[in-house]
């Protein structure tokens, strides 16, 4: 029997193509520095195909031969600092001066694994099973999550705009996960649609924490490579500026903006108090005013003007759902305001007419005693 290195199902080895997913046995990786499917790490994990990759790592589907379960395994691979030939599994430093920086990166990567592992009892945060050093790099073994990232999930909607009610519910679930993370003394630092998994029944899982990225931020590479424009608040662009849980709340506000507007919000550095971004309520006419206000508060340039914590963010979303009129949209607010103004104008006009007529009557009609004197 043969195990498919894409879906990890077992099938008869006489077939070259997996009958479950159609994967062709022996297919090489799309990018030459990715591990070849079938590679074994630590005499335990059989590496499969690539799930995703970025500037700091590659994530593969894998099979844990000891536990007999499908997993995801993330390899630390900072593009620009290392390379790997097709003949070896070991990573090679690109320049002797990068060794200290690279080792610091590995330390941060493994520290991230330990950080995530403390939340293994939580259902809305990815679970870590193992972490190890091998091939002159490091690996994190995590649960394999059936589902898709929010980034991918949004593509099913026209203009990638999610129904408001659904977006609010997902934002509440992310806020709940962030409340747990922050209570554990951790800041995620990388909340974005690509790090939020949508699972069955629209439950969510928070993925990659941003700790492993920090080592590069402290070194020489450009911040534009590290940060995700639109989701990173101003304080993340300044290396000495304090970051706290409000950093994640800005990002969550940006995620909510992305879900309801269909576009990534403007980069923080492009915004000023004098020329701020267009309010989401103007960009989407059926957006309730309270959602507009929540997004703008969460994405305030000054951290002091944002929600103080994730629970406060969630509470605001709950208040909006339960206490605001569902028809309270920006277009209807404008129409309502116009109607109120017109009513006030008419009332003032009627009052003016009443007093005008009364004054004229008093002026033109002589009192009875004056008529008698004149008679």
Predicted regions and their residues:
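Activation-segment/catalytic-loop signature of the eukaryotic protein kinase fold
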Residues: 130-131
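AlphaC helix of the protein kinase catalytic domain
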Residues: 150-162
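Conserved short submotifs of the Hanks-type protein kinase catalytic core
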Residues: 135-149, 153
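Protein kinase catalytic-loop region centered on the HRD/HxD motif
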Residues: 174-186
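AlphaC helix of the eukaryotic protein kinase fold
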Residues: 83-119
């Amino acid at each position: 029997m043969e195990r498919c290195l894409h879906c990890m199902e077992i099938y008869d080895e006489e077939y070259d193509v997996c009958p479950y997913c159609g994967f062709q046995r022996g297919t090489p990786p799309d990018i030459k520095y990715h591990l070849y499917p079938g590679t074994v790490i630590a005499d335990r994990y059989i590496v499969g195909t690539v799930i995703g990759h970025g500037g700091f790592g590659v994530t593969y589907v894998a099979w844990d031969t000891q536990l007999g379960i499908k997993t995801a395994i993330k390899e630390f691979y900072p593009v620009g600092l290392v390379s790997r030939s097709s003949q070896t599994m070991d990573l090679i430093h690109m320049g002797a001066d990068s060794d200290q920086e690279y080792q610091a990166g590995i330390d941060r990567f493994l520290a991230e694994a330990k950080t995530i592992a403390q939340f293994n009892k939580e259902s809305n945060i990815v679970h870590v099973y193992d972490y190890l050093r091998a091939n002159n790099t490091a690996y994190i073994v995590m649960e394999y999550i059936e589902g898709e990232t929010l980034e991918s999930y949004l593509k099913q909607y026209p203009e990638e705009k999610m129904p408001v009610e659904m977006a609010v519910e997902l934002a509440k679930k992310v806020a709940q996960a962030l409340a747990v993370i922050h209570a554990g003394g951790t800041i995620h630092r990388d909340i974005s649609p690509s790090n939020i998994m949508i699972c069955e029944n629209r439950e969510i899982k928070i993925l990659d924490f941003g700790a492993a990225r920090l080592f590069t931020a402290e070194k020489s590479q450009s911040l534009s490579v590290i940060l995700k424009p639109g989701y990173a608040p101003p304080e993340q662009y300044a290396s000495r500026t304090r970051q706290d849980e409000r950093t994640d709340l800005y990002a969550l506000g940006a995620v909510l903006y992305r879900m309801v507007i269909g576009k990534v919000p403007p980069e923080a550095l492009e915004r000023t108090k004098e020329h701020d971004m267009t309010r989401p309520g103007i960009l989407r006419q059926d957006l309730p005013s309270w959602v507009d206000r929540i997004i703008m508060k969460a994405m305030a340039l000054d951290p002091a003007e944002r929600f103080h914590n994730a629970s406060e963010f969630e509470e605001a979303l709950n208040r909006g759902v339960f206490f605001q009129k569902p028809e309270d949209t920006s277009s209807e607010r404008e129409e309502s305001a116009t109607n109120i103004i017109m009513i006030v104008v008419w009332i003032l006009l009627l009052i003016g007419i009443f007093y005008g007529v009364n004054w004229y009557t008093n002026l033109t009609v002589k009192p009875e005693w004056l008529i008698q004197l004149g008679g």
